[in-house]
Amino acid sequence: MEEDLFSLAAGKQPSQQATNETAPRAGEARENAGTDHPGNAEDPAHRRIDYLRSELRRHNRLYYEQAEPEISDAEYDALFLELEKLEKAHPELSDPDSPTRRVGGAPLQGFNQIRHAVPMLSIDDIFEQRDAPVPDEELAEFYHKLSRALQTENVPVSVEPKIDGVALSIMYRNGKLAYAATRGDGDVGDDVTANVRTIRSVPLTLPPGAPPVLEVRGEVFMPNEAFAKLNEERDADGLPAFANPRNATAGTLKQLDPRQVAARPLAFLAHGLGAYEGPELRDAKDFWNMLRHCGIPCNEPVYYTDSLESTRQAVRDIDRLRHTLPYGTDGAVIKISSTATREALGATARAPRWAAAYKFPPEQKETTLLNIVVQVGRTGVLTPVAELQPVLLSGSTVARATLHNQDEIDRKDVRIGDTVLVEKAGEIIPAVLKVNLSKRPQDARPYSILEATKGLCPACGNPIMKEEGKVAWRCTNFTCPAQAVTGITHFCSRSALDVESIGSSVAEALRSSGLASSALDLFSLMPDQLANLNLGTPEEPRRYGEKNARKALDALQNARGLPLERWLIAFGIPLVGEVVAKALADTHPDLKHVADSPYLRDIVRLDELVEQAAKTNPNTRENKKAVKEGALSAEAVQERHQELMEEIDRLTAPYLATGYLRKNTAKFSYGSEIGVAAAKSLRSFFASAAGNHTMDVLHRLGINPQSQSYRASLLEIPAGSLSGKTFVITGTLSHPRDYFEQLIASHGGKATGAISKSTSCLLAGNGGGSKRDKALKLGVPVISEEDFYKMIGN
């Protein structure tokens, strides 16, 4: 990088086009995770580099696209730094798609995409290493690099707090907010204009004299006090707290319903500039003055320095001040002040050369883990939370830390009574890093969620379950009070009962007002109750209104007559999605028959019999050894195995005859989409207290959803024109995505979310670049909407 800086300072600037051409497109890094590199794949450094790239890509996807990070910033930074050092030491393993060359994640499919007028780059990090022998070593190295490039000892820079939020670009044209977009992959981001318009600190119009084109870069965040209040409310409602304000902000900003965004206290602060047409801005001071004139909220305080020592002092001042700021910050951003010098130094494909983010080391302290409590989230997931001896950490007293799940508890071997090291790196609920085993009490026992809860949900007392291959325990109760908001929202969703005017904000108001503690309570609502529902606050009330109330009640009345599969989806039973619900409707005339289904019973029983028969097979090594040693009788083993095989034959005969069960050597496969796991989940639900309560309530309401596709003969479903074909849908089409998914299913095909070699076709509208690129790379045909209609004979 030094050579680039010297050549740039001498006037050799790369064109903007060249910079853009080196920047990877959305999704490329993940798709190229297995790209071959020169060098020996058995070399330890090569293997470690491949591993780090793969892990960083995965964490980028979790952070930027799903807003569900698994690791802290400090852990991510450690992986990133290790990869950078290895790549510098092994230039022969260079890869233009490495995470060290990328900005962030791909745009979400739920939003339209916007191409940034000027690439929205990230900023390179420099670190203060904990207990480093030379303080601020990387800061000094960065400053000296700028000095050498500019051939001057003193470089004027600005220093400001690094906001721990979500990057956002807001475009103003002729004084009006034109659009707002997330960073995305740096070139293309998600259009979140409707959501950003609900943020009160963002001006929708600028005063006279504002630049005709002004693209402001900044951070959306949730103020600390508002975030603490939000978590207090969730705690009072028995909901798990958000891990940190950034997670809450990212999840809120990516809601598809702006009303949900408006209900959350988001704020915005500007710190940078994208496209610009207006009076010349000579330096950072001009930039900040222009923003203030326009009424755009600015990141403060800003320090102006012109030496290494004064820059160090500014960083120390921000470190002291950061716990008093109204938002989370984990560092200080250092930028060259002069606009002309910034343009001369330019940028790499990933970040500007004229700026760096100085990261403070996360604070760590030991404390005692007093207890572990299990909370039930709004989706039914059980989360273990450590209750700690209160300790002062990063300017606030903390007394709890999330332990995430049972696997995390087992991996760290966390036990009640342990002395644990906790870290707060931008986390409101700190992370438990590790256990100090030297201080472990002798009577400390391994912790089990299943044992601690006795297998029952702490919120409702119904059974909990863990799906195969998943890490989370989950409450299966459709009417669990802890899941009220999510349950009602899902119940009313388009794929379920399609009660359009009841979303999550209305569901939250219904729950908090006591009008509905579960989805089935909706059928007992009176028009005046719903019309007078307050969607605002006590200080600023906002009525739901008669029009919305009538609309919702009409939709609920219409829902009574919706087909069986829609109701099965509405219940939110684990593993029962649209495909399984349709198969259940094909094989059962109504809901009562599903609740007491011989078919589901037989699927579960067959699985048990096959497992028992495998254990009693006289030809297994274990049984032969037991017979030889006299522990088992050969005749008894053979007799029991024969009994089981005969019962299997009796059970499967009618299903084999109709084609709903097929046998390949000793294995069975199902002619419908109802597999063993889904059958077990359904049986568990209808046998539970929650399932019985659901059926009782529906009986009182006179509701017994009917199938519109029931085949009494249990014959094989006729193959359609798309039978055996798998489709992926991308881009903007003439109808919503679920319209095409239903068309595909009705013609015997299947719609999935991810491209693979087994995908038959990619149905592509406008946009959808990354999936289109991957389809072409894998040789998957890309078809238009017109091509698709021809395939189904329309």
From Swiss-Prot:
Q: Which Pfam families match?
A: BRCT, DNA_ligase_aden, DNA_ligase_OB, DNA_ligase_ZBD, Nlig-Ia
Report the catalytic activity: NAD(+) + (deoxyribonucleotide)n-3'-hydroxyl + 5'-phospho-(deoxyribonucleotide)m = (deoxyribonucleotide)n+m + AMP + beta-nicotinamide D-nucleotide
Instruction: Establish whether keyword Amino-acid biosynthesis is in the entry.
Output: no
List the biased-composition ranges (Basic and acidic residues): 27-47
Which residues participate directly in catalysis? K162 (n6-amp-lysine intermediate)
So which domain of life are we looking at? Bacteria
Which is an annotated GO molecular function term of this record? metal ion binding
Binding of Zn(2+), residues: C457, C460, C475, C480
Alphabetized UniProt keyword annotations: DNA damage, DNA repair, DNA replication, Ligase, Magnesium, Manganese, Metal-binding, NAD, Zinc
Listed under GO cellular component are: cytosol
Extent of Polar residues compositional bias? 13-22
The segments labelled Disordered in the record are 1-47
Q: Which residues bind NAD(+)?
A: D73, A74, E75, Y76, D77, S122, I123, E160, R183, E219, K335, K359
Q: Name one GO biological process term.
A: DNA repair
EC number(s) given by UniProt = 6.5.1.2
Domain BRCT positions: 717-794
- Output the InterPro entries linked to this UniProt entry: BRCT_dom, BRCT_dom_sf, DNA_ligase, DNA_ligase_AS, DNA_ligase_CS, DNAligase_adenylation, DNAligase_N, NA-bd_OB-fold
The cofactors it requires, by name, are: Mg(2+); Mn(2+)
Query: What is this protein's function?
Result: DNA ligase that catalyzes the formation of phosphodiester linkages between 5'-phosphoryl and 3'-hydroxyl groups in double-stranded DNA using NAD as a coenzyme and as the energy source for the reaction. It is essential for DNA replication and repair of damaged DNA.
Task: Please give the family membership noted in the entry.
Answer: Belongs to the NAD-dependent DNA ligase family. LigA subfamily.
Q: What is this protein called?
A: DNA ligase
